[in-house]
């Protein structure tokens, strides 16, 4: 029976989609709906550490999917912030580590919308390596001032994706959300 089923199988041809405001909205709604469902499921689990871990992994997947499609690959954006003067070899980086974002969401410190739109940066690979060497790869000294994770390790200047220079010592998470509010995909 299995052999016959395999012999009859015809591989589907999936259509390609062009990025439009509608495709970004589709991805946004899909990720939001699934993250909301997973957060609710996480809160209902009692005494099953492996299931909790699997749910955290699933939340991470949808957060990263949104960040990849709706921010990194978004026309004219590539990240919320860019390191000024970085060469072509850059990494897409979360100013607040992705696991911390997920944990903030699970503890209700931030909303799903805020988790989807946390600050991201195009950071030179050399500076990213310095960050890792300093032990800041998956932690941060200050979530309110998200750039302090960098300023404690190296000097650099940053601008928004549309060219506004920001002060990494004083730019707050609240300023980030206010500045980028118009880019939220609803």
Residue ranges and their predicted role:
Residues 1-87, 134-186:
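Nuclease and nuclease-like effector domains acting on nucleic acids or nucleotide cofactors
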Residues 84-115:
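Histidine-centered nuclease catalytic patch
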Residues 114-140:
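Short Cys/His-centered divalent metal-binding micro-motifs
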